[in-house]
């Protein structure tokens, strides 16, 4: 915008992952402007009619990279405008702290001034089209490969078969991390989902095929008081296949937690000779497995 504010139109829709914050942060950090100066618009097919959607932990790696491509285009054109205003060559400029600066001097022009000039081109480079609007598409050169290790410690009540998680540790590698709080939130949510699948959640049918727990009144999901304190950490191995060096994190918690919980329970029952349990590991199933092993 002529005011120096930025609007991002994206084809990936957020449904709880915090795209609005992360995408705005990419642009704000790149241009040296405030987060309040960046507006993210998603789900608007009038402005962005095509988008491959939000799935596969791909939003930051694919959509974030497309945003970064547009950021680079803005900087490249902005350098030509700034060079005209500063009477130098674009190659003599470097962008830092929200300004194009002439190397080795104190001469500079701010991002907002360049944006205003781009839309009010009274003093403007010859043959340069006004405006600072760019659209970018990004096709990943390869897949990203996040990885991690999840450790679960459980206690099993021998009298009732009830499983209690006493400690849960997760260490994941999602490449460069844009927003640590959002990444941690994604891991927490995923781990909770995985614990729910392992211990609580399941469709129950009667002999006639009628679903018995079809509402949230009857379907068992984990509550906050069923969850332990999650201990999380990260290693950082930048992905070489995208400009941000990022990997997806949205599925890490669920992928790691379900087998970690089930394996921990089976390990706790190793003295009974239990080697397999069907999810969810309801107390009656665990108790029955122990009785059968006896």
Question: Whereabouts are the PLM-identified features?
Answer:
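Gly/Ser-rich, acidic/histidine-flanked active-site/gating loops
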Residues: 13
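Short, aliphatic-rich beta-strand segments
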Residues: 5-10, 165-167
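Condensing-enzyme catalytic core mediating Claisen C-C bond formation in acyl metabolism
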Residues: 1-6, 158
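Conserved strand-to-helix beginnings and helix N-cap segments that scaffold or border functional pockets
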Residues: 20-21
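C-terminal catalytic domains of large/alpha subunits in multi-subunit enzymes
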Residues: 25-294
């Amino acid at each position: 915008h002529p005011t120096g504010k930025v609007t991002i139109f994206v084809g990936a829709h957020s449904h709880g992952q915090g795209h609005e914050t992360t995408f705005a942060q990419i642009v704000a950090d790149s241009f040296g402007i405030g987060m309040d100066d960046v507006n993210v618009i998603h789900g608007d097919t009038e402005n962005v009619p095509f988008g491959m959607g939000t799935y596969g932990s791909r939003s930051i790696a694919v959509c974030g990279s497309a945003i970064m491509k547009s950021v680079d285009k803005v900087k490249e054109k902005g350098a030509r405008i700034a060079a005209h205003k500063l009477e130098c060559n674009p190659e003599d400029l470097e962008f830092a702290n929200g300004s194009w600066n002439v190397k080795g001097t104190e001469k500079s022009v701010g991002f907002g001034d360049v944006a205003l000039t781009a839309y009010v081109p009274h003093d403007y480079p010859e043959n340069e089209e006004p405006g600072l609007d760019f659209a970018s598409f990004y096709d990943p050169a390869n897949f990203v490969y996040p990885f991690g290790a999840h450790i679960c410690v459980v206690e099993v009540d021998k009298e009732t078969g009830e499983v209690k998680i006493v400690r849960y540790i997760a260490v994941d590698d999602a490449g460069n991390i844009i927003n640590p709080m959002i990444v941690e939130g994604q891991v927490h949510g995923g781990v909770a989902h995985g614990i729910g699948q392992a211990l609580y959640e399941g469709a129950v049918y009667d002999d006639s095929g009628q679903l018995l727990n079809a509402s949230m009144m009857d379907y068992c999901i984990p509550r906050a008081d069923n969850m332990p304190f999650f201990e999380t950490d990260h290693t950082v191995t930048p992905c070489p296949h995208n400009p941000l060096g990022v990997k997806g994190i949205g599925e890490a918690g669920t992928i790691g937690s379900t087998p970690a919980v089930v394996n921990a329970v089976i390990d706790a029952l190793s003295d009974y000779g239990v080697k397999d349990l069907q999810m969810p590991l309801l107390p009656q199933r665990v108790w029955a497995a122990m009785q059968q092993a006896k």
